[in-house]
């Protein structure tokens, strides 16, 4: 069973066991516009919660993607190199950025669940 949590910077992490899949929300991709490039971290890189994990460039701007939790990068979505627009087409599915092995699952406690994230969007 997986759980999904969200940050106020519009990243999501979908956790199964000790591994989390990280990407940006549909709201984030809609604000960015057409994604033209994604810079992903190296596999094995240690990420710190709130630290830069990736960069996404759109026709409007370049934006940092922050790690929702601390941990080690165990996989990246290499398909985004050839098809960065996948982020726009399926942000919560095939448009994921990286997978991280969680250093401390308790860090998830500070993130929002789906209902909390939807409430947060209403304040924007």
Swiss-Prot record:
The modification N6-lipoyllysine is found at residue 60. One of its GO terms (biological process) is glycine decarboxylation via glycine cleavage system. Its cofactor is (R)-lipoate. Keywords: Lipoyl. Residues 19-101 form the Lipoyl-binding domain. Binds 1 lipoyl cofactor covalently. Gene3D superfamilies: 2.40.50.100. SUPFAM superfamilies: Single hybrid motif (SSF51230). The glycine cleavage system is composed of four proteins: P, T, L and H. Belongs to the GcvH family. The glycine cleavage system catalyzes the degradation of glycine. The H protein shuttles the methylamine group of glycine from the P protein to the T protein. This is Glycine cleavage system H protein. It comes from Beijerinckia indica subsp. indica (strain ATCC 9039 / DSM 1715 / NCIMB 8712). The gene is gcvH.
